[in-house]
Curated annotation (Swiss-Prot):
Name the record gives this protein: Acidic phospholipase A2 homolog textilotoxin D chain
CDD domains on file: PLA2c
Family matches, as InterPro entries: PLipase_A2, PLipase_A2_Asp_AS, PLipase_A2_dom, PLipase_A2_dom_sf, PLipase_A2_His_AS
Glycosylated residue positions: 112
Tissue: Expressed by the venom gland.
Keyword Glycoprotein: yes
Pfam families attached to this UniProt entry: Phospholip_A2_1
Length: 152
């Protein structure tokens, strides 16, 4: 084997070892992102909704900056209610760890009946938010705003 091939192989192995220690995002975040992509294909990366306005992403306060942000406020409230369901084994702030199943067919989202009550509630929260996002324009000016100034 050529020395150059050995160096490439060594580099790949080191990269894989490093990647193994990187924490994975929760599955629910990925499911929610896929739902958004189902309702808004090719328009806006779902990652743009992770830090938008006062309510999309971590932290929630103040008055929503626009209709997209209102979708996120409603989504936060929906997650809180889902976390209160008897038999739902998550705390409201851990609801992102709930796995659920759904189908996307030509922009239409359906939460599968195989979901338990908690999974169905979280799935429907994500479904409603994805549909809500599709109804309103995404304003790049509200991405990654200073929430301490704009969200009082």
């Amino acid at each position: 084997m050529h020395p150059a091939h050995l160096l490439v192989l060594l580099g790949v192995c080191v990269s894989l070892l490093g990647a193994a220690s990187i924490p994975r995002p929760s599955l629910n975040i990925m499911l929610f992102g896929n739902m958004i992509q189902c309702t808004i294909p090719c328009e806006q990366s779902w990652l743009g909704y992770l830090d938008y306005g006062c309510y999309c992403g971590s932290g929630s306060s103040g008055i929503p900056v626009d209709d997209v942000d209102k979708c996120c406020k409603t989504h936060d409230e929906c997650y809180y209610k889902a976390g209160q369901i008897p038999g739902c084994s998550v705390q409201p702030n851990e609801v992102f760890n709930v796995d659920y199943s759904y189908e996307c067919n030509e922009g239409q989202l359906t939460c599968n009946e195989s979901n338990n009550e908690c999974e169905m509630a979280v799935c429907n929260c994500d479904r409603a938010a994805a549909i809500c996002f599709a109804r309103f324009p995404y304003n790049k000016n509200y991405w990654s705003i200073n929430t301490e100034i704009h969200c009082r």
